[in-house]
Amino acid sequence: MNIIDELSWRGLINQSTDLEALREEASTPITLYCGFDPTGPSLHAGHLVPLLMLRRFQQAGHNPIVLAGGATGMIGDPRDVGERTMNSADTVSDWAERISGQLSRFVDFDGEHAARLVNNAEWTNEMSVVTFLRDVGKHFSLNTMLARDTVKRRLESDGISYTEFSYMLLQANDYVELNKRFGCTLQVGGGDQWGNIVSGVDLNRRVNGTSVHAVTVPLVTDSDGKKFGKSTGGGSLWLDPEMTSPYAWYQYFINASDADVIRYLRWFTFLTQEELAELEVEVAERPFKREAQRRLAREMTNLVHGTEATEAVELAAQALFGRAELRDLDEKTLAASVSETAVAEIKAGEPRTIIDLLVASGLADSKGAAKRAVKEGGAYVNNERIESDDWEPFAEDLLHGSWLVLRRGKKNFAGVQILG
């Protein structure tokens, strides 16, 4: 199957230049690229669809280039509201290096169609202002640039600086450089990048006399129109395990709605049409089993964190519900799993009966409610039912020397860390 047909049935083509011409060109190996500006210390879930596009093309026998925006990251693509914070050169350079280190999970840098990593600071930082204005700026119509939706919205509100206004030119020039240096003839990117990408297509025609292509992927939202990739705490869902734990990552995907899960499986995984059709039947006929959600969470955690982390996360989920031993969890996984709910810290000398712990952890809003939970048999510590109001933990009850997992009823969890 031609890679363009593969992308089409997955619903991954949002906008494109001449798709038939690209399909014909992609019948033999092409070179393509996607750029990522280091606007933070890690890639996040929103980067995955365009990044995985590179992997899909590579698996189909094409040659991907990953561009780290060491120069464009100093400027920032204009957003709908307000100027971006200008980060220091050292910060952007550090972030670019950290992001570069995450890429090997997604594209292969060895073999016949090895991916290439480039940084646009290499050519942008060497360009003088006069050269930029003469060789790049003269090819852009101010009318066209002002017609861009984001620019229009900014001009109607708080305005836009020349710095951000010129971002489009820098990105377009990247495409020209990659075409000159490596014969790159396709840029892929997010749907919000269409204006920048087609500017690069046009600049290649004017400067290099070449016909190149552009494809954007859909912006990922859930069925309610909410932005994809925000964690339960409201922050970004980072690919760095130190910023978003594998447990939190897994939980995000296992909680996908029935309305979203098949679309996410098409866009984020490499499952076949046949496998996806079977899971679609599961969602329609047996949604309570959440088989598609489990498959999505497993595939995504394997992809980003590896199979060992996935196994640890799934063991943690089972242990919280009493289907595996909490003591079998390593401390990092245990802490991450309970931190998704609430964690109470109990210092030396503070009362620590089961009643105190239930109130401190937020599982009971009063001592009276805590006592009722114990009396009704609904209070658990480390999956053991507590039957006495005056129960206190002994040293041997503490997981990894300091942790307790509290549960009220079947599904309400909290962590307690004993500090002294």
UniProtKB/Swiss-Prot annotation:
It comes from the Bacteria. The keyword Transcription regulation does not apply. One of its GO terms (cellular component) is cytosol. L-tyrosine binds at Y33, Y167, Q171. A motif ('HIGH' region) lies at residues 38-47. GO terms for biological process: tyrosyl-tRNA aminoacylation. A motif ('KMSKS' region) lies at residues 227-231. Pfam families: SYY_C-terminal, tRNA-synt_1b. Keywords: Aminoacyl-tRNA synthetase, ATP-binding, Cytoplasm, Ligase, Nucleotide-binding, Protein biosynthesis, RNA-binding. Transmembrane segments: none annotated. The keyword S-adenosyl-L-methionine does not apply. It catalyses: tRNA(Tyr) + L-tyrosine + ATP = L-tyrosyl-tRNA(Tyr) + AMP + diphosphate + H(+). Its EC number is 6.1.1.1. ATP binds at K230. GO terms for molecular function: ATP binding; RNA binding; tyrosine-tRNA ligase activity. Residues 352-418 form the S4 RNA-binding domain. It is found in: Cytoplasm. InterPro entries: aa-tRNA-synth_I_CS (IPR001412), aa-tRNA-synth_Ic (IPR002305), Rossmann-like_a/b/a_fold (IPR014729), S4_RNA-bd_sf (IPR036986), SYY-like_C (IPR054608), Tyr-tRNA-ligase (IPR002307), Tyr-tRNA-ligase_bac-type (IPR024088), Tyr-tRNA-ligase_bac_1 (IPR024107). Homodimer. Catalyzes the attachment of tyrosine to tRNA(Tyr) in a two-step reaction: tyrosine is first activated by ATP to form Tyr-AMP and then transferred to the acceptor end of tRNA(Tyr). Belongs to the class-I aminoacyl-tRNA synthetase family. TyrS type 1 subfamily. NCBIfam families: tyrS (TIGR00234). HAMAP family: Tyr_tRNA_synth_type1. This is Tyrosine--tRNA ligase. It comes from Corynebacterium glutamicum (strain ATCC 13032 / DSM 20300 / JCM 1318 / BCRC 11384 / CCUG 27702 / LMG 3730 / NBRC 12168 / NCIMB 10025 / NRRL B-2784 / 534). The lineage of its organism: Bacteria, Bacillati, Actinomycetota, Actinomycetes, Mycobacteriales. The gene is tyrS.
